[in-house]
C-alpha cells in the first residue's frame, strides 16, 4: 500500500500519456484497496488477540484512531504544502508532494512489522493443528458462518461506514464543493474538528468494555439518522450565510422534459452529461444552488428560472467536442452571472464564516463517527472463531466501507442533481444507518463478554 501511494505522486499527467493516466491512477487505487483489505482485519485481529479479556474495546480503539488521525495528518500536510507553494503551484504539481513524502512512512511501517510475532491465540491454534485449511469455504461456504457475515454487513458495518464517511469525507465535499468555502479554510476547519474528536474513539472503545459494543454503535447510527438534516442545514447558514439568504430570496426552478434528465451517477468522473436538462442541473448542483423541478413538454429545451429571469439551456448531443466546450462555457458564464445578480455567491466569503459554529457542528458529526467506529473492531473480532476470524471479519468490513461508504459522495451528488435539493443526498446515509440500526438492534448479539480464545 505504501509503494502504490508513492507511485501516485510519480504518475504522468493526462497531457503526457492521455487515457493511460486515469487508468494508471485507478490501478494504483485498486492496489491500495487490495492492500488495505489485508491490513485492517489483520491489525484488528492481532491487537484483539493480544488484549486481556475486558479490555479489547480499549486496545482496538487505538487502531480506529489511526484512520481519522491519518486523515488529520493528511489535511495538515496539504495545508502546509498549499501555504508554502501557493495555490497555483499546488494545483499544477504540488499535490504530488504528500504522496512522495509518504515513502518515509513506508520505511517506518516495515521496521515495526519486522518486530512483531504471532498472537498467542493464533500460535496455539497452529500448534494444536486446528487451523482452517480452506478459510474462504469455511467463512462463506457454510451457512452458519455466512449468516453471521451477512448480519455483520447489514446490521453493523454498512451503517458504520456511511456515518464514518459522512462525518469525515462528505463534510469536506459539502463545505468545499457545495457551500464553496476556500479549500484551505475547509481543510483547517475539518482538521480542527477531527483533532478535537479523535480522543473519543478511545473513550467509546473503553466504554464498550463496560456497557457493550452494540448499544454505542447502534446509538451512533440512530443519532446520525435523526440529526443529519438539521445539522447540515445549520452548517449552510454558518459557513455560507449569503447562499442561505439567496435560496430564500431568489428561488430557482428548472423546467425540463423529464425524459431529458439523467440520474448523474458517475463514480469515475468520465461520463459526459450533455442534454439540456443535465447541463442545467449539473451546474446548479455543483454551484450549491437549491432548485425545484417543473416538468416541461416532451422535446423542449430545459430552462432555468431565477426569480423573474429565465435562461434556456442548449442541447449538447451530437456536437463536436470543441463546439460543445464553447457552448458549455458560454452557457455556464451566463447562468453564473444570472445567479450572481440574484445574490448567489460564486464563493463563500471567508469573513462571514462562523468558524466556532462550523467547528462545533463538524465536531458533533465526528462524535457520531467515534461512536460507531471506536468499538467496531472489537465487535467484529468477537463475532468469529480464531481459525476463520481474519477472513470472515474482513469481508463485511470492506464491503461495508468500500461500497456503502465509498459510493456515498457520488451517490449523494447524483441525488442532489436529480432533485435540486442540496440536502437530499443525506437520505442515502440516513436510510442505510436506519436499516443497520433496526437489523442490529433486533438481531445482533452483544459480544463484549465473548472468550475469543475458546
Q: For each of these PLM feature ranges, what is it?
A:
Residues 1, 210-221:
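Cytoplasmic membrane-interface "Motif A"-like loop-to-helix N-cap segments
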Residues 109-116, 228-238, 431-454:
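Multi-pass alpha-helical transporter architecture, strongest
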Residues 114-136, 453-454:
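Flexible cytoplasmic inter-helical loops of multi-pass small-molecule transporters
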Amino acid at each position: 500500500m505504501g509503494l502504490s501511494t508513492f507511485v501516485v505522486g510519480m504518475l504522468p499527467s493526462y497531457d503526457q500519456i492521455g487515457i493511460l493516466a486515469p487508468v494508471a491512477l485507478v490501478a494504483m487505487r485498486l492496489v491500495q484497496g487490495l492492500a488495505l483489505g489485508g491490513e485492517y482485519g489483520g491489525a484488528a485481529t492481532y491487537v484483539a488477540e493480544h488484549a486481556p479479556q475486558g479490555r479489547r474495546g480499549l486496545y482496538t480503539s487505538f487502531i480506529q484512531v489511526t484512520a481519522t488521525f491519518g486523515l488529520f495528518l493528511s489535511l495538515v500536510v496539504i495545508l502546509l504544502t498549499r501555504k508554502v507553494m501557493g495555490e497555483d503551484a499546488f494545483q499544477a504539481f504540488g499535490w504530488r508532494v504528500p504522496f512522495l513524502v509518504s515513502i518515509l512512512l513506508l520505511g517506518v511501517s516495515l521496521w515495526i512489522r519486522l518486530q512483531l510475532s504471532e498472537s498467542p491465540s493464533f500460535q496455539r491454534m497452529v500448534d494444536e493443528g486446528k487451523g482452517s485449511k480452506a478459510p474462504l469455504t469455511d467463512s462463506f461456504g457454510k451457512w452458519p458462518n455466512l449468516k453471521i457475515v451477512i448480519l455483520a454487513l447489514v446490521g453493523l458495518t454498512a451503517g458504520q461506514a456511511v456515518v464514518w464517511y459522512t462525518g469525515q469525507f462528505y463534510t469536506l465535499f459539502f463545505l468545499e464543493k457545495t457551500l464553496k468555502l476556500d479549500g484551505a479554510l475547509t481543510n483547517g476547519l475539518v482538521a480542527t474538528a477531527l483533532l478535537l474528536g479523535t480522543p473519543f474513539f478511545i473513550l467509546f472503545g473503553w466504554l464498550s468494555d463496560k456497557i457493550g459494543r452494540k448499544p454505542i454503535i447502534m446509538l451512533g447510527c440512530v443519532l446520525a439518522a435523526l440529526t443529519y438534516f438539521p445539522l447540515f442545514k445549520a452548517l449552510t447558514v454558518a459557513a455560507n450565510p449569503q447562499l442561505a439568504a439567496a435560496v430564500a430570496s431568489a428561488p430557482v426552478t428548472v423546467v425540463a422534459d423529464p425524459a431529458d434528465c439523467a440520474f448523474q451517477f458517475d463514480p469515475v468522473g468520465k461520463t459526459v452529461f450533455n442534454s439540456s436538462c443535465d447541463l442545467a442541473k449539473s451546474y446548479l448542483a455543483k454551484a450549491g444552488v437549491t432548485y425545484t423541478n417543473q416538468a416541461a413538454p416532451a422535446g423542449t429545451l430545459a430552462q432555468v428560472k431565477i426569480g423573474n429571469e429565465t435562461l434556456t439551456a442548449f442541447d449538447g448531443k451530437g456536437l463536436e467536442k470543441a463546439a460543445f466546450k464553447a457552448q458549455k462555457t458560454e452557457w455556464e458564464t451566463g447562468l453564473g452571472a444570472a445567479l450572481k445578480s440574484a445574490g448567489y455567491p460564486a464563493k463563500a466569503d471567508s469573513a462571514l464564516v462562523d468558524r466556532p459554529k462550523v467547528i462545533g457542528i463538524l465536531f458533533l458529526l465526528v462524535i457520531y463517527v467515534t461512536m460507531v467506529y471506536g468499538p467496531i473492531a472489537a465487535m467484529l473480532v468477537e463475532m468469529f472463531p480464531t481459525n476463520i476470524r481474519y477472513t470472515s471479519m474482513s469481508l463485511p468490513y470492506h464491503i461495508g466501507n468500500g461500497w456503502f461508504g465509498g459510493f456515498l459522495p457520488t451517490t449523494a451528488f447524483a441525488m442532489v442533481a436529480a432533485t435540486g435539493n442540496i440536502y437530499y443526498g443525506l437520505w442515502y446515509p440516513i436510510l442505510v444507518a436506519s436499516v443497520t440500526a433496526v437489523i442490529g438492534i433486533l438481531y445482533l448479539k452483544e459480544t463484549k463478554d465473548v472468550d475469543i480464545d475458546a
